[in-house]
Amino acid sequence: MSDEICEVVITGPDADWLAEFTRMLVADRFAACGQNITAIRSIYRWQGAIEDATEARVALHTRRDLVPAIVERADHDPPYAVPCVIALPVVDAAPAYARWVLAETKPT
């Protein structure tokens, strides 16, 4: 079991889809919480064309060793052919907050 926490960023097609996906991850204890940001503007290259789309984004706080399970969930419930899921290390956090994240997520 790892005591390292991280932030996992996921984008989705809209706020409703992403809120439901976040709720599922929190309910199943894959994430302690998720802060959803709606109406972000994404500009990216896809299949040879430049796309300009409105999306939603969530920042999940979780254990580092749960990231593969979150990636697997995103791959199995995808709104996109190539879902955006990235994990960023948390270099430092308030000790009480880090303990809370660990307590609210399931140990592997």
Model-derived segments and spans:
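Positively charged, small/polar-rich N-terminal and surface patches that mediate targeting and assembly
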Residues: M1-T108
